Design a protein with these regions (language model features):
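Active-site-proximal alpha-helix that buttresses catalytic centers in soluble enzyme cores
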Residues: 2-294
Length: 294
């Protein structure tokens, strides 16, 4: 993995976790959505619907808090096993913005950092835009901005597969023991335009990771669905949609479904509303027992 830090190359002075960001209180939601949309025309009723989604999940996204917890855990791990590097957090769409974090890093004397994009699968939406945002932030700071290299993609890393598998195994205990073998694992990821997907390894990496988790758990019944579609209805996006899959599972007699958002590495509105509220309502309406790994 040529972009990873090595013990023989001690030039890295910090780690930078790069995430999307999210509103931390209800008053932040509309400014946050303005940042996300960046002037793109969206029907007002759609914006109001998303605002209501945040109201239903407590008026905030836990993404920022969870990302900082991940940063602290990584910093502790690095202190224990080396190299003992500080871990910073920078966000695309909310505070702390990437340019703010890079400015703090520069002030602390950081010249070169290793960046970790907080998404396990690669597409332009999940990786490319983040790298361009880092480039723009560095350009804003000027020639002495910290250099940022990136770890390679990690969709099939054994520790990632183990972590997801452990959470899924815990979720399956909510299903009666005699029905677990017949339960359906339904892996989900954010839908993206099909043209974007075709230009990236996104679908292959999602499917590969899902297969590895299913094999690790010896679970024969599994499939992949996409969620949280947005954008123009005239533009084709990845399918099948999770709602359609849940209805089809019920029609073929499935009783239990364990939903695994393998395309996300922590909770936020697409998990807490799109899955825990919207998808759960669909499942319950068609008679499915809906369980999600947490």
């Amino acid at each position: 993995m040529p972009n990873e830090p090595r013990e023989s190359s001690p030039a890295y002075e910090a780690v930078l976790l790069i995430a999307f960001g999210g509103p931390t209180q209800m008053s932040d939601v509309r400014p946050f959505l303005d940042n996300v949309l960046r002037g793109r025309p969206v029907p007002p009723e759609r914006i109001e619907a998303v605002v209501h989604h945040y109201e239903l999940i407590g008026g905030r996204s836990p993404l920022n808090e969870l990302t900082f917890r991940q940063a602290r855990a990584l910093e502790t791990e690095l202190r224990a096993h080396g190299p003992a590097l500080p871990v910073y957090v920078g966000m695309r769409a909310w505070e702390p913005y990437l340019h703010e974090t890079l400015q703090r890093m520069r002030a602390a004397g950081v010249r070169r950092a290793i960046g970790i994009i907080m998404a396990a699968q690669q597409s332009d939406a999940s990786w490319g835009r983040y790298q361009r945002e880092v480039d723009a932030a560095r350009a804003r700071l000027g020639a002495d901005a910290p250099q940022v290299d990136y770890v390679d993609e990690w969709h099939a890393h054994p520790l990632f597969i183990d972590a997801v598998s452990d959470r899924v195994a815990a979720a399956r205990t909510q299903i009666p023991a005699e029905r677990r073998a017949a339960a359906q694992l339904l892996f989900t990821a954010h839908s993206v335009p099909t043209a974007m997907a075709a230009a990236s390894p996104y679908v292959e990496q999602i499917t590969d990771a899902a297969c590895l988790v299913a094999e690790r758990l010896a679970q024969a019944h599994w499939s992949v669905a996409y969620q949280s579609r947005s954008g123009s209805p005239r533009e084709p996006w990845l399918e099948p949609d999770i709602g359609a899959v849940l209805r089809a599972l019920a029609q073929r007699g499935t009783r239990d479904v364990v939903v695994v958002p393998i395309g996300f590495i922590c909770d936020h509105v697409e998990v807490l509303y799109d899955l825990d509220i919207e998808a759960r309502q669909i499942a319950e309406a068609v008679g499915l027992n809906f369980v999600r790994n947490v």
